[in-house]
Amino acid sequence: MRERASAEEVKTRCEENGLEVPRDLLDADGGTMCASTLDLYIKYSKYSVLAFLMNTFPAVRDRMLADPRFAFKLMVETGADVVMNTATEIKQRGDVFWDEFEFFACDQIAAFAVNTAILTICSPAIVLGNTTRSMRKLGELSKNANGAAKVWYVARKYVGKLPANVFMLDPKLGMMAKLARGGATVIARGGQIFFVSTLCGTVGQATANSLMMLRRAAGRDKYSKGYAESIDVSVDPPVLDTGLLWGRFMMFSANIRQQLVVGGERAVEQFTAGMPSASGRRLANGATVALRVFNNLKGGSDFNDFVIGQAIAEASRRDGGHA
């Protein structure tokens, strides 16, 4: 089998399978694709859920094509989080669970989006073509820019060349170069995770508050009697502060934990590479389940501790201000 499929072959095979050639592939120089990647793209497109993910989220698609197990990892990561969060919320909220259901539902949706984004950010991706239009444009802008704009474009270009996680650093690099690029990778991924987590947390809390106000406007009979009597209409959960709380926690804790999980999976995959395919796949999948379930348990526990710590610190600041 040839290493790369020509642009004409890519177009023909996609049309034969009732698919459109990805827009960014058409924008790439030459429009060629690795033959194995093309086979995987066509295979995934036959499954409606995977086809939806690939067509809707190009970043997820590029990870799925780079790693045949990415979809499984995503399912375990998000599925385990949903199950454990639901169990925890039911236990903690108890009798008021249905009275606060809008907050639970919005938290779940926001958490799903954040978990998907974090795994995507820290996972390797394929580049469908050679040089995409956006990369060419970035190169042109960096050449013509001056001052702060020049620094910004150069920084963007540098970050774009960093690996998805520290375990993908070039082994040929010296120790100091590895430390520098490894540190830059952690910081860059942390910045991306902070932005996404803050956005999801803010939107999720704003949506929950809006649903809460609509529910209250419909009448207190929409709540249990005891809960209705305890409602303070003058107080709403903070929106931006909640988003920033998510962002601060995720950029450090979730960033490091996700990179460690990806590194663990990478080590297991390398270990199973020489094993029979069925046995190796079962071992790799088992390791993914164990690592990602533990990651969710650890993350949930750490987040609760973080929230409590932030609440105590805020109370101390208020007490100090009144002193």
Annotate each predicted stretch with a short phrase:
Residues 1-323:
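Glycine-rich, hydrophobic membrane-spanning regions of integral membrane proteins that mediate transport
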